[in-house]
């Protein structure tokens, strides 16, 4: 399963990690995914969302 937010589609970013000597190597910044249960018209559904999306869901009272 891809490390992607199931509601917003937000995925990992890529770039370089740099030392003080300016050496570089490729790395990946993954999304902080959390399991959440959201309200739907049929009841509730469990989804993987980013921490930022989870915060927004809590703000708008959309969690089951």
From Swiss-Prot:
The keyword Glycosyltransferase does not apply. GO terms for molecular function: structural constituent of ribosome. It comes from the Bacteria. One of its GO terms (cellular component) is ribosome. One of its GO terms (biological process) is translation. The keyword Zinc-finger does not apply. Residues 1-26 are annotated as: Disordered. Keywords: Ribonucleoprotein, Ribosomal protein. Belongs to the bacterial ribosomal protein bL28 family. This is Large ribosomal subunit protein bL28. It comes from Ureaplasma urealyticum serovar 10 (strain ATCC 33699 / Western).
């Amino acid at each position: 399963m891809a490390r992607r937010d199931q509601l917003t589609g937000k995925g990992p970013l890529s770039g370089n990690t740099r030392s003080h000597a300016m050496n570089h190597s490729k790395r990946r910044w993954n999304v902080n995914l959390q399991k959440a249960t959201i309200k739907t018209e049929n009841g509730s559904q469990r989804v993987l969302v980013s921490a930022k999306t989870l915060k927004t869901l809590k703000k708008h009272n959309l969690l089951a």
